[in-house]
Every structure is written in structure tokens, then in C-alpha cells.
């Protein structure tokens, strides 16, 4: 009897375990499918946004043409052809400066903006376009190795969702055709499938680069090199802008990390509700800088206005300054505003490996120090804010860097009364918050006995629950949460919005140091 009961009990345990495992597996699969659907929805949303932008452009152009035809038809039907011709020749409409204003020599040849060489199937409608400019190098070319690194680290389905455009910035057609021949031999399958395209500009695209003004202490040769480089970037961007949702600028002497494509795409989709302009996946120069396709027209136009004046990375920073910086505010305020348009992903996904520069005689031992670093902080886009703390910072791991996604915050032993303050530049409607302390190298350096508090813009007539009202402090802040096991997260009572500031308050002395490696103050999305 005991044996039978034991057998029944064993069977019940087995059945229960099996059902539990089956339920968990089903739940986990369902969760993964939901995440996948959410990503696909965000991707579709981005495609629709880009399509809407392009349709709007085409609609405006077509409307202008239709109006001209209607007017011409009406005038002709009234037997006023001569009068119409006189009007057209005597009256000139106001003109907005175009590419021909900045590069007037292009008017001398109607093919100046058409690739002299174009290899590939012309794939469009992808998520990411990767642009790689390359020129003749005196010592060694790294192009083949770069392409192998990019292509070999793509999964089959990813190869269908991107296009790699190699821009050969040379007008010597013999050299261009020799590069094309090498690429066709090495990557014939990728070219025929549409994954890889190769283009080169016509000789008439370039202006006279012999009499450029020497600036910033650069030699005449370097000024010519950087000026031509700006023009190369512009041609490549103009060619790429109609092909996909995002455009990422690469170089011909890099290697990449595994799973780079999926990482880039998911990071961009996570930020789809934010008004970013540049996502950075490398800290070096122009490598790994990604734009949204509709923004490329603005980038190209700005570069062409100043292509002879400054290098590309300086010009990019000027674009951001023009867009968001207030001349009446200080540099810190400007940096905070720019940080919302220029968002850095860490660790870097691209590493520079070229030793010999495309500039003749230049040796450059540039490497991205973040390429092999473990991820010690998690990056989010937070509302622009002035940050401050009473805590003693350790070795330059400042709160400002953490809030801007550059580094984790590390402070020496917190004591009762210490605080961390985030004062928003403008009041913000906040949906939720997340603060995570400690990291994988120092998991014990966490915030303990610390509360989360918010300061509403309006302290009176708040439509909030009695429970929330009871958490009001003497200085007008409301205590809405606390750290548990090093983490504080929660939903903000909508009645408290808009919020002027967040504050983390230490209420008891701590026995350990504190690291803050994740800050996410999530705005309400419209």
C-alpha cells in the first residue's frame, strides 16, 4: 500500500512538474512573440513615417508642376501665347538656394550628379543603409576585410533588410573598374542579391580644389583632402537617402561586433518616440554615425554650405548647435540640449583597424577604447535637466555623464541627508521612472535606504489620490518610491504632472559606496 501511494505521489509530482514546465514554456514563447510583434510594429511605424515624408515632398513638387501647366493652358487657350512668353521671360520667381548655388560648376554638365559607375540591383525599402566611402591608398587597402566583417556578421534574414553601398571616391575610371572587378570576384553573390552596391562619381562632380583657403593650421594638402572628403560624404548620402529608413556612415578600414545589425536596429526602434538626429555606435570621427533618412537632406545641405571651411565631424556638431542651443544660455545647457539629439550607444560596435590613412603619408593609430569594454551602464534618453548631488564623486564618474549616457555614476559612502537632484529645464509629464544601482564589476555598490521624490509644477489643486497626498513633504516634494535591493522603479501618479524635478534622498547612513548605472525618466508619449 505504501509503495502504491509512493508511486501515485511520484506520478503526481511528475505530472505537476510537466504541466508547470509546459505552461512556463508557453508563456515564455508568448512573451518572445509579443516582443517580436512590438519590434515589427515600431519598424512599420518608422517606415510609414519615412514614406509620409517622401509622399509630402513628391506631392508638393507635383502640385507646383500641375499649377504651371494649368496656367500655361489657360493662357494658351486665350490666344495669349506671346503674352505668356513675355511674362515668363520678364518675371523671375524668387529662388531658394540649391545645390547649384553652392556648387555652380555642376550646371556645366547634366550628368554631374549621376554615378559614373553603378553596380548592383538598386535595392530599396530596407531598414538600414550602410555607406562606405573608399579612395586609393598608397600603402594598403582594407576594403575587402571591412566588407567581410560586415557581411559575415549578418544573419540571412538581416541580409535581406539592409544594403551596403561602397562609394569609390576616384575619377580615374581604370582604377575604379579595377576595384569593381575585385569586389565582383570576391562578393558576386552579395552584389547579385542586392546586398552590396558599388558607385563612383563623375569627374564633373568635383569643383576645382587647387586654390582652397588654408584654415585651422592645416596644410594645403590636408585642406584639399578634408574638402574632397566632405563632397564624397554628400554624394554618398544623396544616393542613399531614398533606399531605407536609416543611414549609417562607416569607413573602409573597420571591423564590427557580432549581432551588430540587430543591436543597431533595436536601439533605433527603442528611440522611435524621441526626436534624435544622430545615433553614435562608435566614438571615433564619423564612424558609426546613424541618421534617419528624412534628415539626410538637411545634413547634406548644411555640409555643402561649409564644405570648404571645416571637417565633417565639426560640421555635424554645428548642425546640432544651430538646432537646439540658446546663445543666451551657458555651454552646459547647450550640451544637455545636444545630448538629446546626439545619442551614444555603448559599448562601441565598430573598431578602427586601418594604420595607413587615405591622407598621403599619415599614420593613424586610432582605436575605439569602448569597443571591448563591458557594458557598465544602460543608456536611456532622459528629459533635458540640470543635475546635482551632495555626494562625493569618485574618479570622475560624474552624475552628468551618467544622465547623458556616457559613464556610470560612482560616489563615496552616502550619509543621511545626501541627495541626487534632476531639475528639468522645462516641466515634464512623466509616465514612469527607473533607477538601477551597482554594476557587474561592483555589484555591492548599491543605493540603500534611499527614497524617490518628485516636485510637481503646481503644488496646489492637484487631482491626486489620498494615498499620494499623504506622501507630501514639507518642501513640496512627494515621496513616490524607494530603493529595494538597489533598484527603484514605479509609475508616476498622472495627477502630479507636469513634474519640475526628481530627487533621490538618502535617509540613513550607508556602509558601502554607491554606483548609479541606469537612469530612465520616461516621458508620457502622446
From Swiss-Prot:
Annotated TM spans: 7-27
Top enzyme class: transferase
Pathway, per record: Protein modification; protein glycosylation
Regulation (activators, inhibitors): Inhibited by UDP.
Reaction(s) this enzyme catalyzes, per UniProt: N(4)-{beta-D-GlcNAc-(1->2)-alpha-D-Man-(1->3)-[beta-D-GlcNAc-(1->2)-alpha-D-Man-(1->6)]-beta-D-Man-(1->4)-beta-D-GlcNAc-(1->4)-beta-D-GlcNAc}-L-asparaginyl-[protein] + UDP-N-acetyl-alpha-D-glucosamine = N(4)-{beta-D-GlcNAc-(1->2)-[beta-D-GlcNAc-(1->4)]-alpha-D-Man-(1->3)-[beta-D-GlcNAc-(1->2)-alpha-D-Man-(1->6)]-beta-D-Man-(1->4)-beta-D-GlcNAc-(1->4)-beta-D-GlcNAc}-L-asparaginyl-[protein] + UDP + H(+); an N(4)-{beta-D-GlcNAc-(1->2)-alpha-D-Man-(1->3)-[alpha-D-Man-(1->6)]-beta-D-Man-(1->4)-beta-D-GlcNAc-(1->4)-beta-D-GlcNAc}-L-asparaginyl-[protein] + UDP-N-acetyl-alpha-D-glucosamine = an N(4)-{beta-D-GlcNAc-(1->2)-[beta-D-GlcNAc-(1->4)]-alpha-D-Man-(1->3)-[alpha-D-Man-(1->6)]-beta-D-Man-(1->4)-beta-D-GlcNAc-(1->4)-beta-D-GlcNAc}-L-asparaginyl-[protein] + UDP + H(+); an N(4)-{beta-D-GlcNAc-(1->2)-alpha-D-Man-(1->3)-[beta-D-GlcNAc-(1->2)-[beta-D-GlcNAc-(1->6)]-alpha-D-Man-(1->6)]-beta-D-Man-(1->4)-beta-D-GlcNAc-(1->4)-beta-D-GlcNAc}-L-asparaginyl-[protein] + UDP-N-acetyl-alpha-D-glucosamine = an N(4)-{beta-D-GlcNAc-(1->2)-[beta-D-GlcNAc-(1->4)]-alpha-D-Man-(1->3)-[beta-D-GlcNAc-(1->2)-[beta-D-GlcNAc-(1->6)]-alpha-D-Man-(1->6)]-beta-D-Man-(1->4)-beta-D-GlcNAc-(1->4)-beta-D-GlcNAc}-L-asparaginyl-[protein] + UDP + H(+); an N(4)-{beta-D-GlcNAc-(1->2)-alpha-D-Man-(1->3)-[beta-D-GlcNAc-(1->2)-alpha-D-Man-(1->6)]-beta-D-Man-(1->4)-beta-D-GlcNAc-(1->4)-[alpha-L-Fuc-(1->6)]-beta-D-GlcNAc}-L-asparaginyl-[protein] + UDP-N-acetyl-alpha-D-glucosamine = N(4)-{beta-D-GlcNAc-(1->2)-[beta-D-GlcNAc-(1->4)]-alpha-D-Man-(1->3)-[beta-D-GlcNAc-(1->2)-alpha-D-Man-(1->6)]-beta-D-Man-(1->4)-beta-D-GlcNAc-(1->4)-[alpha-L-Fuc-(1->6)]-beta-D-GlcNAc}-asparaginyl-[protein] + UDP + H(+)
Subcellular location: Golgi apparatus membrane
Post-translational modification: N-glycosylated.
Record protein name field: Alpha-1,3-mannosyl-glycoprotein 4-beta-N-acetylglucosaminyltransferase A
